[in-house]
Each structure stands twice: as C-alpha cells, then as structure tokens.
Amino acid sequence: IGVERREDNKRITFENAIIAVGSQSLELSNMPWGDPRLMDSTDALELEEIPGSLLVIGGGIIGLEMACVYSALGSAVTVVELTPGLMPGADPDLVRPLQRRIAKRYAAIHLETKVTRIDVADDALVAHFEGKHEGQEKFERILVAVGRTPNGDRIHAKAAGVEVTSRGFIPTDNQMRTNVPNIFAIGDVVGQPMLAHKATHEGKVAAEACAGEKSAFDARVIPSVAYTDPEVAWVGVTEAEAKESGLDYGVGKFPWAASGRALGNDRTEGFTKLLFDKKTNRIIGAGIAGPHAGDLIAECAPVSYTHLRAHETT
C-alpha cells in the first residue's frame, strides 16, 4: 500500500489489512458552509459558548442527541424533520415517550418540513421552511444532521481490487472480508447501523478471521441506542421489519408506570417490549424507552441472540 505523508511517500507491505476509514457528515447543498454558525455534528462538539437559539436539521439519532445536549445547557432548540416522525428506523411507539417529553422542552418540533435555504445575516442565520411549517426564522446556530456518508471511495480502494459501491460502502461477508481475501473492512464504511460498538465488534471478528479463527458477525444482535432523554434502544427485529416481512409475531409490553423504581425516580414515561414469533414462541426482538435504556438493552441482546421462548423470560 502507498501512503502519502507530509514529508514523503511510503510503501507498506502486509499479509492482511483492515479498512476502517469511517464516514463523514452529509452536507446539504446550497448551504452557507463558509459561515461557522452553520455546523455539522463534529462542529457542534467544539463550541466554546452555548447558543441562545439552535436549529437542528434532521430528527434522526445524531440530531436528537445533540438537541438534547444543547437544550439541557439552555439553548432554545428547534428540530425540523422531513419525514412524518422522529428517529426513522425505530418503532414509533419507542420514540413516542421521547417526543412527548421534548415537545414540552424545545421551542418547536416541525415534522414533514424541509429547510429550502439559509440566509446569512449579521446577527443570525435565517432558515426558510417549506412543508407543514412555512415561513422563516432566525437562529444563532444551525446544526445539519441529515446522515453520514461512508469514506470508501476516498482511499483509492478500487486500485487494490476492493469493491466499492456507488454510495461509497465496501461490501463484506460475515467475517468482514472484502472481495479481496486478505483485505477486511469494518465500521461505518461497511454499512448500517453506523455505531461505534458495532465497529468494535466487527474489528474483533476481522482480527480473529485474520488469525484463522472461525468467527462471524451478525448485525441483528447489535443494539441500537439513542442517547437522548429519555434514551431509546432496540435490538433484533423491529415491529416495522416484522410487518414488512409478513411475520406472524406477538408483542409483550411492560409500562414503567408499574415500576416502583421508575415511580421513585419520577420517570414513568418509559416501557419495555419484547417481540416473539407466534409459531415458535421465540423472542426475536426487544425495545426499551426510558432513562438508561442504553444500559438495560444489554440484558435483551442475549435473549434475542439465543431466541429464548417468551415464557422463559421474567
């Protein structure tokens, strides 16, 4: 492999290689990216002062996580999302406790609305809205969080014979091996879900495969977590996926309003649910909404992985 460095170029030989080049924030076109008041998620972590008002474009996990942070720090937060619901990909009932809570705390949440353009003014950025919410509003800062794009097409992987899709992803098998037998890929560059803990496990699988171990990766047992307030987490098959595949499934729910600890913490808005296959009674998925859902979902991952029967859980 050839490496271009500041001082010189260097060639490195290897028996096996792992590509872990990640992804970058997706930038909307026709936006004034030269203005530092327009940010991506990386910029939002480097602010030296808290903005009085913040517009978050994108109601996905990253956008909502940053919205929760800055709302807690005192910003008047507005979220705009193009689709009919927040956090696409999660089951709507899991998102509902979060949406009810932030609706009381944020300045506004605009669904089925898009930002058509952003004008630069001396004292603010002016966002123009189209859709269910029309008009224009001023904000001290605007965060664009509409997704991420993989970096697979930025490293000349094709020169080594590695397949890269038109979207920049690098396809792999369940050992994280690319179409070139001694080159592996992990993390955001191999596809969804784009989660750090997924990438860590993929790295373990790839390293074991390099060492000749019989290791394999199954994305279905990797939990997805939104570190919002309340947190939202799920693992395995979602209800939307079960419906789409025509699976005959059942749902068991436990409302946290019936939990003494939740009552003591005055956080009863959450719930836990399990999905099971009605034919086999085996658990195929789980979801949790509420404080510390990201920790609690770890209890559900082995249940989903081992396909315990519904009556075997308590």
Predicted regions span which residues?
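Single conserved hydrophobic/aromatic residue that forms the stacking wall/gate
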Residues: 307-314
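FAD-site-proximal beta/loop scaffold in flavoenzymes
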Residues: 34-51, 137-210
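Short hydrophobic core segments
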Residues: 13-22, 140-147
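Mid-to-C-terminal Rossmann-like scaffold of FAD/NAD(P)H-dependent oxidoreductases
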Residues: 91-93, 104, 115-116, 148-151, ...
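Conserved redox-cofactor binding core of oxidoreductases
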Residues: 1-18
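A Rossmann-like FAD-binding core segment of flavoenzymes
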Residues: 1, 73-174, 237, 244, ...
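Glycine-rich dinucleotide-binding loop and its adjacent helix/turn
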Residues: 21-75, 80, 105-109, 158-160, ...
